Amino acid sequence: MKKIFTPFALLPLSLVGLLGNNIAVAQTEQVKTTKQTLNLPAPNLDASKNRFSKVIGWPEGKTPVAPAGFTVTKFAGNIKSPRNIYVLPNGDVLAVLSNSERSTKEQIANVISGKAKSEQGGESANAIILYRDSNKDGKPDLQSLFLSGLNQPYGILVIGNTLYVANTDGVVTYPYKTGATKITGKGKKIAALPAGGYNNHWTRNLIANEDNSKIYISVGSGSNVGENGMENEVKRANILEINPDGSGEIIFAAGLRNPVGMAWAPGTKKLWTAVNERDKLGDDLVPDYVTSVKKGGFYGWPYAYFGQHEDPRMAGKRPDLVKATLVPDIAVGSHTASLGLAFYNGKKFPAKYQGGMFIGQHGSWNRSELSGYKVAFVPFKNGEQAGPMEDFLTGFIADLEKAEVYGRPVGVAEMKDGSLLVADDVSNTIWRVAAK
């Protein structure tokens, strides 16, 4: 797919330089707040091991497991690869259906390596399904094809009478009316983005600020660690900022290898994102993380990781950027593929969870033992982390020794009734977690 870039003239001067020339520990120790010391192992280029999970699907009647006091039910099924979930202002639920599209050569290689068994394959559905629960019983009584003919969509946003959809190659707007079950108007592309990306870095997410005056777009890298040349990473590994009409594009934050989930911490103006860090430095490097994002901030990729730890593959190339690298807020485990992100704003969950953060961890492949494959929770109070990360929704791993999994969680979203929805792309399911 053709890559379209905007001129450097659109970028703030503080970041033009960043992009023109383009930072032994157990997994359980990688969930501390980084206000504490995080002891990382030395990078080892020879220690990297691949272990792809094998998806076997959920047996009839079996569900993921939530803590005591919660119920888990199937909200929707038999839909191909639900990756993201967006709850409309009127309570309708949009499920974004999309998956990686592989060339014939890639498909053959993935069969040989075992990767094909761990992901949703074939042609992407490239569609959005609408669900409506009219009688509020936790089960949708209406399902409608809301929008189709998209290009690997992921992010959705509604501002007034405008629907925004982030395809892999750009942001498109459509006329929208509250209560509509199908989009019939023609789309208008308002922002071009570089398409595709390394591994599964084709997702583009969207979020607006409180007064809807700015929109933020997450864009992942085109490589693991810049191995294809930084000239191929323009507008990548960033969170971009635009006006609602697509104008005024700037790079809001850079050096974020693959930022996917984005959310505002309740009661604050802090934008948080979930970031997938780099591969092939060993089982316990580099920790994925969630972090609040500072305007103009640089978070290391590809030169440094988790603060000013220089990547040996980029040694000596940009010591200035290594020095400028910010330390992320919360480590969430290496290779966990932490993608989904949502803060809980409701009152139906116990007080412990109110205001807290939920993280959809899609699960590892570049690690000798599986990590992730769960929804994690981080308690927050007054918009700040108030305790260590803990498991919330588990049971996705069927057999750790055989690396068999029932499913893989991705997007997370809170419904208007205070329940939590979890997209499980490889099992074609959306789960609903509700307090008893």
Label every model-predicted segment.
Residues 28-67, 104-105, 203, 221-227, ...:
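Beta-propeller domain segments
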Residues 94-96, 165-166, 216-218, 272-275, ...:
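Residue position within the beta-strands of beta-propeller blades
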Residues 124-127, 140, 168, 184, ...:
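A detector of repeated loop/turn-to-beta-strand junctions in beta-rich toroidal repeat architectures
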Residues 79-90, 148-162, 196-214, 254-270, ...:
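Beta-rich, blade/repeat-based domains predominating
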Residues 139-162, 167-209:
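Asp-box/WD-like beta-propeller blade repeats and closely related beta-sheet repeat scaffolds
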Residues 116, 126-129, 170-172, 238-240, ...:
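A short loop-to-beta-strand structural motif that recurs across blades of beta-propeller domains
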Residues 413-436:
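Blade-level signature of beta-propeller repeat domains, shared across WD40, Kelch, NHL, RCC1
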Residues 90, 98-100, 168-170, 176, ...:
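Short loop/turn segments immediately following the C-termini of beta-strands
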